[in-house]
Amino acid sequence: MASGVTVNDEVIKVFNEMKVRKSSTPEEIKKRKKAVLFCLSPDKKEIIVEETKQILVGDIGEAVQDPYRTFVNLLPLDDCRYGLYDATYETKESKKEDLVFIFWAPDNAPLKSKMIYASSKDAIKKKFTGIKHEWQVNGLDDIKDRCTLADKLGGNVVVSLEGVPLK
Protein backbone atom coordinates (compact mmCIF):
# COMPACT_ATOMS: atom_id res chain seq x y z
CA MET A 1 0.00 0.00 0.00
CA ALA A 2 1.54 3.31 -1.06
CA SER A 3 1.11 6.27 1.24
CA GLY A 4 1.65 9.07 -1.28
CA VAL A 5 4.68 10.25 0.71
CA THR A 6 7.48 11.55 -1.51
CA VAL A 7 11.25 11.43 -0.99
CA ASN A 8 13.02 14.79 -0.64
CA ASP A 9 15.90 15.34 -3.10
CA GLU A 10 18.34 15.82 -0.19
CA VAL A 11 17.67 12.21 0.90
CA ILE A 12 18.69 10.96 -2.56
CA LYS A 13 21.77 13.21 -2.52
CA VAL A 14 22.87 11.84 0.88
CA PHE A 15 22.33 8.25 -0.33
CA ASN A 16 24.39 8.83 -3.48
CA GLU A 17 27.20 10.45 -1.48
CA MET A 18 27.28 7.48 0.90
CA LYS A 19 27.04 4.91 -1.89
CA VAL A 20 29.84 6.21 -4.10
CA ARG A 21 33.23 5.85 -2.46
CA LYS A 22 35.47 7.95 -4.65
CA SER A 23 39.02 8.80 -3.70
CA SER A 24 38.85 12.06 -1.83
CA THR A 25 41.00 14.43 0.14
CA PRO A 26 41.32 13.72 3.88
CA GLU A 27 39.00 16.70 4.54
CA GLU A 28 36.32 15.32 2.20
CA ILE A 29 36.58 11.89 3.82
CA LYS A 30 36.03 13.44 7.28
CA LYS A 31 32.78 15.02 6.03
CA ARG A 32 31.53 11.72 4.62
CA LYS A 33 28.48 10.33 6.40
CA LYS A 34 28.92 7.06 8.28
CA ALA A 35 25.26 6.91 9.32
CA VAL A 36 22.17 9.04 8.87
CA LEU A 37 18.52 8.92 9.90
CA PHE A 38 15.55 9.96 7.79
CA CYS A 39 12.14 10.96 9.12
CA LEU A 40 8.82 12.23 7.87
CA SER A 41 8.41 15.97 7.49
CA PRO A 42 6.13 17.66 10.07
CA ASP A 43 3.23 17.58 7.57
CA LYS A 44 3.89 13.84 6.90
CA LYS A 45 4.08 14.43 3.13
CA GLU A 46 7.75 13.69 2.46
CA ILE A 47 10.75 11.79 3.78
CA ILE A 48 13.54 14.17 4.81
CA VAL A 49 17.06 13.98 6.25
CA GLU A 50 17.05 14.32 10.03
CA GLU A 51 19.91 16.83 10.15
CA THR A 52 20.88 16.36 13.79
CA LYS A 53 20.89 12.57 13.56
CA GLN A 54 24.00 11.61 11.64
CA ILE A 55 27.55 10.44 12.20
CA LEU A 56 30.42 11.76 10.10
CA VAL A 57 33.50 9.66 9.37
CA GLY A 58 35.62 12.50 10.79
CA ASP A 59 33.87 12.16 14.17
CA ILE A 60 35.00 8.56 14.62
CA GLY A 61 37.80 8.30 17.14
CA GLU A 62 37.13 11.83 18.37
CA ALA A 63 33.52 12.62 19.36
CA VAL A 64 32.40 9.08 18.43
CA GLN A 65 34.30 6.11 19.86
CA ASP A 66 31.93 3.36 18.70
CA PRO A 67 29.98 4.34 15.56
CA TYR A 68 27.59 1.38 15.79
CA ARG A 69 26.61 2.06 19.41
CA THR A 70 26.33 5.78 18.66
CA PHE A 71 24.01 5.01 15.73
CA VAL A 72 21.80 2.82 17.93
CA ASN A 73 21.63 5.65 20.48
CA LEU A 74 20.41 8.06 17.76
CA LEU A 75 17.24 6.01 17.26
CA PRO A 76 14.18 7.42 19.05
CA LEU A 77 12.55 4.94 21.43
CA ASP A 78 9.02 6.20 20.72
CA ASP A 79 8.87 6.78 16.95
CA CYS A 80 9.83 5.24 13.62
CA ARG A 81 12.74 6.17 11.35
CA TYR A 82 14.59 5.01 8.27
CA GLY A 83 18.35 4.81 8.49
CA LEU A 84 21.40 4.21 6.36
CA TYR A 85 24.44 2.74 8.06
CA ASP A 86 27.76 2.33 6.24
CA ALA A 87 29.00 -0.86 7.87
CA THR A 88 32.72 -1.61 7.84
CA TYR A 89 33.38 -5.25 8.58
CA GLU A 90 35.84 -8.05 8.10
CA THR A 91 35.13 -11.56 6.92
CA LYS A 92 37.56 -14.44 7.08
CA GLU A 93 38.68 -13.45 3.56
CA SER A 94 38.62 -9.64 3.31
CA LYS A 95 37.56 -6.22 4.59
CA LYS A 96 34.24 -4.92 3.27
CA GLU A 97 31.97 -1.90 3.41
CA ASP A 98 28.26 -2.13 2.70
CA LEU A 99 25.32 0.19 3.15
CA VAL A 100 22.54 -1.20 5.30
CA PHE A 101 19.00 0.21 5.01
CA ILE A 102 17.26 0.06 8.37
CA PHE A 103 13.55 0.46 9.01
CA TRP A 104 13.21 1.29 12.71
CA ALA A 105 9.68 0.66 13.99
CA PRO A 106 9.87 0.25 17.77
CA ASP A 107 7.01 -1.55 19.47
CA ASN A 108 6.05 1.54 21.50
CA ALA A 109 5.83 3.89 18.50
CA PRO A 110 2.31 5.20 17.80
CA LEU A 111 0.31 2.88 15.54
CA LYS A 112 -0.36 5.69 13.05
CA SER A 113 3.36 6.38 12.76
CA LYS A 114 4.14 2.70 12.18
CA MET A 115 1.49 2.54 9.47
CA ILE A 116 2.73 5.65 7.64
CA TYR A 117 6.39 4.59 7.81
CA ALA A 118 5.59 1.01 6.73
CA SER A 119 3.49 2.16 3.78
CA SER A 120 6.14 4.72 2.74
CA LYS A 121 9.09 2.33 2.95
CA ASP A 122 8.86 1.32 -0.72
CA ALA A 123 9.12 4.97 -1.81
CA ILE A 124 12.50 5.40 -0.14
CA LYS A 125 13.74 1.90 -1.03
CA LYS A 126 13.09 2.55 -4.73
CA LYS A 127 15.40 5.57 -4.54
CA PHE A 128 18.13 3.55 -2.80
CA THR A 129 19.23 1.41 -5.74
CA GLY A 130 21.90 -1.19 -5.10
CA ILE A 131 21.30 -1.69 -1.38
CA LYS A 132 22.28 -5.28 -0.53
CA HIS A 133 21.13 -5.36 3.08
CA GLU A 134 17.76 -4.37 4.51
CA TRP A 135 16.82 -4.76 8.13
CA GLN A 136 13.54 -4.10 9.93
CA VAL A 137 14.08 -3.53 13.64
CA ASN A 138 11.28 -3.39 16.22
CA GLY A 139 13.19 -2.66 19.41
CA LEU A 140 16.56 -2.12 21.05
CA ASP A 141 16.90 -5.82 21.84
CA ASP A 142 16.95 -6.49 18.08
CA ILE A 143 19.72 -3.99 17.31
CA LYS A 144 21.88 -3.30 20.37
CA ASP A 145 24.12 -6.34 19.87
CA ARG A 146 26.47 -5.82 16.93
CA CYS A 147 26.39 -9.59 16.28
CA THR A 148 22.83 -9.18 14.99
CA LEU A 149 24.03 -6.76 12.29
CA ALA A 150 26.95 -9.08 11.53
CA ASP A 151 24.42 -11.87 10.89
CA LYS A 152 22.61 -9.62 8.38
CA LEU A 153 25.91 -8.87 6.63
CA GLY A 154 27.05 -12.43 6.19
CA GLY A 155 26.36 -14.60 9.17
CA ASN A 156 29.18 -16.60 10.65
CA VAL A 157 31.78 -15.42 8.09
CA VAL A 158 31.91 -11.93 9.67
CA VAL A 159 34.74 -11.77 12.22
CA SER A 160 34.65 -8.06 13.15
CA LEU A 161 32.36 -5.04 12.81
CA GLU A 162 33.74 -1.49 12.99
CA GLY A 163 37.07 -2.93 14.10
CA VAL A 164 35.53 -4.74 17.07
CA PRO A 165 36.02 -8.53 17.02
CA LEU A 166 32.83 -10.58 17.30
CA LYS A 167 32.73 -13.22 19.98
Curated annotation (Swiss-Prot):
Domain of life: Eukaryota
Pfam families given in the database record: Cofilin_ADF (PF00241)
SMART domains: ADF
Alphabetically ordered keywords of this record: Actin-binding, Cytoplasm, Cytoskeleton, Nucleus
Disulfide bonds: none
Record domain ADF-H: where: 4-153
Segment forming the signal sequence: none
InterPro entries per the UniProt record, alphabetical: ADF-H, ADF-H/Gelsolin-like_dom_sf, ADF/Cofilin
Family matches, as SUPFAM superfamilies: Actin depolymerizing proteins
Subcellular location: Nucleus matrix; Cytoplasm, Cytoskeleton
Biological processes, Gene Ontology terms: actin filament depolymerization; actin filament fragmentation; actin filament severing
Family (UniProt): Belongs to the actin-binding proteins ADF family.
Function recorded in the entry: Controls reversibly actin polymerization and depolymerization in a pH-sensitive manner. It has the ability to bind G- and F-actin in a 1:1 ratio of cofilin to actin. It is the major component of intranuclear and cytoplasmic actin rods.
Protein name as it appears in the record: Cofilin-2
